């Protein structure tokens, strides 16, 4: 009886083991490996391993999975060498990256030495190391050209100039950041730049610290120009006695008869002149800045310069640097008393003082000054003097030049001369040729009124006995035909 039951039990096992073609048995075998626990396996391990096979079971070949490495040129994933195995398998989907990531190191490893465990999770470091150790390519020595990202090291101590304001410099790296916070500590060094070079897709602008928080651009220009311009002292720009200079010292101005300071930031040295020389030196302090409206002062200042120049006095015109404001005043003087245009006057001064460079605001005001001179051209023509190097002008010659306002002065104005046959001639009792049109007449009267107001102010400033001759010459210089016309009924 016992034998019969054992035989039935054996027959039941035989029915299961020796019917491999049964459809039910095929359903239990999972021939396509669809029910394997992939999460339990390593992401880079094979889908099927001999250790996972059931002893005594029939092995069916697994279908070949998708192979990402079968290309003409194998793609290296994150610089990891391909695993040598009988059947290559795809990596886990979480490890797949775009082709562009092959050439870029991760953020946290930009400045570290590349190792076989680069950019791998902590759970897979040991397994990848084992795989790479069994491979002939386990040395993992990649060529430097694959690393396309470079961080720059800048030694700022070579770029920083003493006494010069902080400058900004752009670092042309592919992936750097802005280490502005580190500038609070002081000068950056190479380690500071590398520390902040880990962020992506940013361009670095290093802002070097300033030595003085109150340092401005005028002080920088003054320091530069005082070292490179006017090395031999005041420069003679209009012979024989008109000089251009930057900020002078007290001993520099003691050798001049007239000093015009047109810089607001330069202190007035008039009160420092010794008493025994105060009567000899005439000092004017005009508080101009780089954005001042200088046109309103040009008429008075150019007349003061012209009076002293014609008397042979030694004149010094200066500002802080001697290249912008003071140069503009001398250009205005040349335009008025040498009868030159703005370009010609500027080129004349530029030929002597190579470093002059008025800013555009002053240039535009000189253009306005030239327009004013062209509108008052008959009056200015009588005040035009010859070049000093061609003809030395004395006081008598200046008086005769300013007084002689004959018709010969208008030979360069044929349109005005042709108006002598105008019906308005009968209403003019002056023997001089005068403007005939209402617009010209109104402009002449306005210019004369402005000129007389400036002359009154100038006469008050020159009321001392020592300057009586200057005042007389200045008053005579406006005795022109427009002045005579003002007294007509």
UniProtKB/Swiss-Prot annotation:
It catalyses: O-phospho-L-tyrosyl-[protein] + H2O = L-tyrosyl-[protein] + phosphate. InterPro entries: Dual-sp_phosphatase_cat-dom, Prot-tyrosine_phosphatase-like, Tyr_Pase_AS, Tyr_Pase_dom, TYR_PHOSPHATASE_DUAL_dom. CDD domains: DSP_fungal_SDP1-like. Residues 1-18, 451-460 have a biased composition (Basic and acidic residues). Changing residue 319 to A: Loss of activity. Residues 419-450 have a biased composition (Low complexity). The modification Phosphothreonine is found at residue 178. The active site is at residue 319. One of its GO terms (biological process) is fungal-type cell wall organization or biogenesis. Gene3D superfamilies: Protein tyrosine phosphatase superfamily. Residues 1-30, 375-401, 419-489 are annotated as: Disordered. It comes from the Eukaryota. Induction: By pheromone. Its EC number is 3.1.3.48. The modification Phosphoserine is found at residues 22, 98, 151. It is an enzyme of class 3 (hydrolase). Residues 233-375 form the Tyrosine-protein phosphatase domain. Keywords: Cell cycle, Hydrolase, Phosphoprotein, Protein phosphatase. Dual specificity phosphatase that dephosphorylates MAP kinase FUS3 on both a Tyr and a Ser or Thr. Has a role in adaptation to pheromone. Present with 538 molecules/cell in log phase SD medium. This is Tyrosine-protein phosphatase MSG5. The gene is MSG5.
């Amino acid at each position: 009886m016992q034998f019969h039951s054992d035989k039935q039990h054996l027959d039941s096992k035989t029915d299961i083991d020796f019917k491999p073609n049964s459809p039910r048995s095929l359903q239990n075998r999972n021939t396509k490996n669809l029910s394997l626990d992939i999460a339990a396996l390593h992401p880079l391990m094979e889908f099927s391993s001999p250790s996972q096979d059931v002893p005594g079971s029939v092995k069916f070949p697994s279908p070949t999975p998708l192979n990402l490495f079968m290309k003409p040129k194998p793609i290296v994933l994150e610089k990891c060498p391909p695993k040598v195995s009988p059947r290559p398998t795809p990596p886990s989907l979480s490890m797949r990256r775009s082709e562009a990531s092959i050439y870029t190191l991760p953020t946290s490893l930009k400045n570290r030495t590349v190792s076989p465990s680069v950019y791998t999770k902590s759970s897979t470091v040991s397994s990848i190391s084992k795989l790479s150790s069994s491979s002939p390519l386990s040395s993992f020595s990649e060529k430097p050209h694959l690393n396309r990202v470079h961080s720059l090291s800048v030694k700022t101590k070579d770029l920083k100039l003493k006494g010069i304001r902080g400058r900004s410099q752009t670092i042309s790296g592919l992936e750097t950041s802005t280490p502005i916070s580190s500038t609070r500590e002081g000068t950056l060094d190479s380690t500071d730049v590398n520390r902040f070079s880990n962020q992506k897709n940013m361009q670095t602008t290093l802002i070097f610290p300033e030595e003085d928080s109150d340092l401005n651009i005028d002080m920088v220009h003054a320091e530069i120009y005082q070292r490179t311009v006017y090395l031999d002292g005041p420069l003679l720009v209009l012979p024989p006695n008109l000089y251009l200079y930057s900020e002078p010292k007290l001993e520099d101005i003691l050798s001049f008869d007239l000093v015009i300071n047109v810089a607001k930031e330069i202190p007035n040295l008039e009160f420092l002149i010794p008493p025994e020389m105060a009567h000899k030196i005439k000092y004017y302090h005009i508080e101009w800045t780089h954005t001042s409206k200088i046109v309103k002062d040009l008429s008075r200042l150019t007349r003061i310069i012209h009076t002293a120049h014609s008397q042979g006095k030694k004149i010094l015109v200066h500002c802080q640097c001697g290249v912008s404001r003071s140069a503009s005043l001398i250009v205005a003087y040349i335009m008025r008393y040498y009868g030159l245009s703005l370009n010609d006057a500027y080129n004349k001064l530029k030929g002597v003082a190579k470093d002059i460079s008025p800013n555009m605001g002053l240039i535009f005001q000189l253009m306005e000054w030239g327009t004013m001179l062209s509108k008052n051209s008959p009056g200015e023509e009588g005040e035009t003097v010859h070049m000093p190097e061609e003809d030395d002008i004395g006081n008598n010659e200046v008086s005769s030049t300013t007084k002689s306002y004959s018709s010969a002065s208008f030979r360069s104005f044929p349109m005005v001369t042709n108006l002598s046959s105008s019906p308005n001639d009968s209403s003019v009792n002056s023997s001089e040729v005068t403007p005939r049109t209402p617009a010209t007449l109104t402009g002449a009267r306005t210019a004369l009124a402005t000129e007389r107001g400036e002359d009154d102010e100038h006469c008050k400033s020159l009321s001392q006995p020592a300057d009586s001759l200057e005042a007389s010459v200045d008053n005579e210089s406006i005795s022109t035909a427009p002045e005579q016309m003002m007294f007509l009924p």
